[in-house]
Swiss-Prot record:
It comes from Rhodobacter capsulatus. This is Uptake hydrogenase small subunit. Heterodimer of a large and a small subunit. Its cofactor is [4Fe-4S] cluster; [3Fe-4S] cluster. Its EC number is 1.12.99.6. It is a peripheral membrane protein.
Amino acid sequence: MSDIETFYDVMRRQGITRRSFMKSVRSPQHVLGLGPSFVPKIGEAMETKPRTPVVWVHGLECTCCSESFIRSAHPLAKDVVLSMISLDYDDTLMAAAGHAAEAAFEETIAKYKGNYILAVEGNPPLNEDGMFCITGGKPFVEKLRHAAEGAKAIISWGACASYGCVQAAAPNPTQATPVHKVITDKPIIKVPGCPPIAEVMTGVITYMLTFDRMPELDRQGRPAMFYSQRIHDKCYRRPHFDAGQFVEHWDDENARKGYCLYKMGCKGPTTYNACSTVPLERRRHFPIQSGHGCIGCSEDGFWDQGSFYDRLTTIKQFGIEATADQIGWTATGLVGAAVAAHAAVSVLKRAQKKNEEA
């Protein structure tokens, strides 16, 4: 891989000064939640390590992961694609098409065998020998297996590749299957979401480039740095939940006041993702901030978990102490009763305080 330029080489060729280069290093440092002491290490990695070859393939999907990725602000998607990595194949973003694109695919996986990262967006359908998704004249599942043979690691972008998403929802007529159930002999990083957060996607790539290893994963194979806490734990509407203040109808006064959306079906208490932290840092909206509850799109099988507007009744407890590894899918309890009791206690305490003050 010595013939591949480093990120710093590309920046210098574009006329970027070293001072500006070191400033650019701070964006991934913030996204990854690393302290200032890591800036030199990230800088050294980007200055000395060759850009990582990436092969990005698409199965059954809507391309929302790519749409999210190109909107990354820290770092910018253009810096990732044109400077940090060597994106040698992506049939959505590349200029080549048809036979030229497939030739580039074969050349890349042969030239960088054992050194490239395989990024998978979408999943392979297995019914009818994979004929429900054809790419390059062949079933996508064949292309996936072929590309995975020489990959050093695989990234499953989005809910489709990680868990199956809508195309795998019951009765799943195409037998759409998550990547990890088809490829079982390679390390796989799941980055679920529909779509995943842009900065989470670029953050995973930056981490792998900087430290030359996979990030720490939780028991479901997701990067713990982004998927270790529930959206509910850091939600800006959490104080309203604790105070027993809930939206009862979409057009009521409580909705206009920005109260908690739990009773409207918000899945934040059981969904592990960075939605309630990363978007706020970018000053951009996420569903809860726009007035709609979380639908749990980064959790396994969320399409088959009932209506997006049904109130949750199967979470274990409240608080920010538990992580995905500690409770995850085993969480149980009568949440409806717990919320009612919690709200009642909150109201009684406020009433008691007012009486004491009076």
